[in-house]
Amino acid sequence: MSGAGAPKLNIDASDLQVAIVVTSWHTNITDGLLAGAERALKAAGNETYEIWRVPGAFELPLAAQKAIEAGADVVVALGVVIQGDTPHFDYVCSSATEGLTRVQLDYGVPIGFGLLTVNTEQQALDRA
């Protein structure tokens, strides 16, 4: 998927309780993702969001669920998983994606999907 054609939205998020759940792996990349999410929220009028740090992508769904249970109106999930030499990449990416989808559907609360699943660190840097 390319960033070309991304929608230009005018959103008022000033009254929303927003939780950003972000992984702790590859902070050189996730810090950039987090900064971008913070800029977008501030542009939408929200400066009272909460940041929830988790170890890795596998923990994103549970953190999203807990954030919703704590009152979040919307969750933004951020992280990066970089392909290695084992199938671990596939398991983590699938589990995180399916888990976030399940939480979103079970709770009826939107979850912005900002989990980069890439082949190389450079791809992640280019997308962050």
Q: Residue spans of the language-model regions?
A:
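Short, ordered loop/turn segments at secondary-structure junctions
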Residues: S24-W25, V54, G79-V81, L115-E121
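Active-site rim loops that border cofactor/substrate pockets in soluble metabolic enzymes
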Residues: A43-A70
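Short gly/ser/thr-rich secondary-structure transition/capping motifs
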Residues: M1-G5
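Glycine-rich phosphate/diphosphate-binding loop of Rossmann-like nucleotide-binding domains
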Residues: K8-R53
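Short, well-ordered secondary-structure micro-motifs
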Residues: D31-L33, P61-Q65, T86-D90, Q123-D126
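C-terminal binding/interaction regions
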Residues: S94-A128
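Glycine-rich phosphate-binding loop
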Residues: A63-L100, Q104
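Short beta-strand segments at enzyme active-site cores
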Residues: I51, D73-L78, P110-T117
